[in-house]
Structures are given as C-alpha cells and as structure tokens.
Amino acid sequence: MSSTRTFPGESSAVSSADSSLSASAQPREITIAHSPDSDDAFMFYGLATNKVRVPGLRFTHTLSDIETLNRKAMDGNGAYDVTAISFHAYPYIQEHYALLPSGGSVGEGYGPMIVAKRAFSEESIQRKRIAIPGKLTTAYLVLNLFAPGIETDVVPFDQIIPELLEGKHEAGLIIHEGQLTYTRSGLYRVLDLGAWWHKTTGLPLPLGGNAIRRSLGPELMAKVGAALRESIQYALDHREEALNYAMQFARDLDSRSADKFVGMYVNQRTLDYGTDGREAVRRLLEMGHEAGIIPHAAQVDFVG
C-alpha cells in the first residue's frame, strides 16, 4: 500500500538584492516528490524546512513510495516537476524528464539484498519465487540481470519482511532500511546485489535519482537543480540537525542505525555522481536493454 503525504516548503523569500521581482509577484510553484525514507528526508531537509530558499520559487513536497512515484512519472507528462525515480524507470520517462546531476542514491559495493528465513546458496536463487518491491525498481532490474526469468511476486516494500516471516514467500528482495534491520527478524542474507554488481562491472550500483521535467526549460531546470544540490550540501554540513529531522521517517531505526543508513546513501556522490557514477547509470540501462528487460534503449541525459 502506498503512503502519500504532502507538505509545503515555502521557499519563496525575495532577497533585497533581487530587484527583478516585485513585492506583489507570486512565486513559481515547483512540485517535488520523493520517498518517505530517512535518506530522502535528509537530502531534502534544506528545501523542506526553508533552510534553503530560492527567490521567486516555492517548493511543495509530496511523499510516496518509490514504485508509486515511478508509475506517476510515466503518467502522461509526469505528475511532478521533480521526482525521485528508480533508474530502471528512466527509459520509460526520458521523453519528458532529464536526470539532475545530484540527489542520487548509489551503493558502493552494497545494495538491495535477497533474504530468507533459512540460508541457501546463491546458485539456488534462480529456482526460488522472490517477493519484490516493484517491477520498476532498480532492485528488480539487477535481480533479473543476476537471475534472468526468475519468478517474482510484487509486495509493498515494507511488507516483504513480515510476509517472509509468515511463510508467504521463499525469499524477499529488500530495499531501504530493511538492509539494516533484516537480522533483527532472524532472516539470512543470501545475496547482496550491490556486491554482485560491483564484482561483475567494477562500478558502483546506481539505485535511484531525481528527474526533472524538461518542459520547465533549461534555465529553470538548472536553477532547481542548484537548489537541490544546495539542500544536500546544507544537510551534510549540518548533519545532526538534518538527522534529527530525518528520524521521523526512519522506520524501525534507532538514531545510530539511521545515521549509518543515511551515510550509505547520502554522501559526496549524492552531490555529484562522478564520472564512474554516470557511467554506471549508462551501463546498468544498457545491460537491461541488451538482456531484453528494458524494451528500448535509454538516452541518459543529465542536466549539466
């Protein structure tokens, strides 16, 4: 079940130096959507709480699970000006969206995991039926690269571990905070797909990023992209403050675990993918297309 929340970020203050905006001018609304997870909350902290303001713009934030955001981005011209997406979804929305150069969640030799109630070999994964968090998630794409044609059942990401414990599935593909909490439930890690990806390609695993609507135009796209980067930098520079805010979204994590999770997915690479990070996005989508998982080739386009 998806969970959607909306709250305003009134980033509309006009600086005294900006004489181009009159006192009566209405700020331009920019709609932003991201997942209700501690890492996303951390990176958007600056914008969501007005620590980062952009003259002439007002940001409103919608929170929803990543598979729902993937689907909404595919709806017509897309539901939001800026949206978090799984990289697997990008080829389906590339006509209307470009990728922002910051805001990515990238695993450095780690990533989504296959877990189960009992241990079994990596080689036997192909013969299992796996609970997955959505068919547009990057986790699902990488699972199919590892085990082509594997049988799966779509389950809301936050229900995968409970359903494994109830015996409804042989194994589950976990994302988000589940990567740190699965052992509390007595589950075994069968495979870390981020580690497999790094061993196979030598690259980090790009899981998700932020896409921006092309119809905003180059100037506004760049301005919004700079605001997001400033928000991430603010959170990194004011870590304790931003972590305290992010804790309200940290499902089942104590402050120490939330700090660890945020550190895994919000770091210097979140500010800038780097050459190898951008190459990893291209390689991932190329491999998905070549394997027949993605029906058409991706034209990876970063703003700047």
Predicted regions: what they are:
Residues 52-63, 146-159, 294-300:
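A local structural motif
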